[in-house]
Amino acid sequence: QLHPELKDDQSLQSLTQYCTEIDHFGEIHWPEADHVRYEFMLHELIRGLEFQDPHSDEQQLHFGFTCLDSVYASLTLRHKAQELLEQEGRPFELPEPKALAIETSNDDTLKLAQKQGYELVVRKDPKLGSIRIKLRPDTQFDLKPVADLIHQHDTEGTWYYHPSGKMFLNGSSKHRDQRPSPLTLAEVVEIIKQAYAK
């Protein structure tokens, strides 16, 4: 073994499994295997680059390695998000929708939880104090009742209600002048429960 310290690296294992699957033409078993969306995947992009410039092996290698490094970084964030959801995620009861709350700085937990079936996810960043509440786009609900109630309880934080009705966001990494909410995660969960009580 060249690097025994990488034996338990989940991200590297995921990357290796994916590359092996592609090498064995395993994508024929994917759902809607002939769908155009798969042309946007890494192995097809490398093939497209080869078609564009068939004589530049160095350019293809550089592009491929840059993409693989990026995928490895994304996988590391995803595996960490999965671990956090399992250890720190707190499902809470609503008549509808299925909901989960989590306190973490890892923003990947939001999307991953939604992909796992949670329709509403609320995340509070313990470092920044910001809060993000999101609904899956395919839900029949919107966050207007939640937004209205939060505005009654929080007059300090800067909140943004997305026109889709599926996102209600406090704080922003792009706009540093926005104020975090003083509400705790537990308080936000209680407000959400009140908003959707039947």
Regions found by a protein language model. Give the residues of each.
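Internal, conserved structured core segments that host functional sites
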Residues: L2-R90
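Gly/His-enriched, cation/cofactor- and phosphate-binding structural elements
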Residues: S74-K198
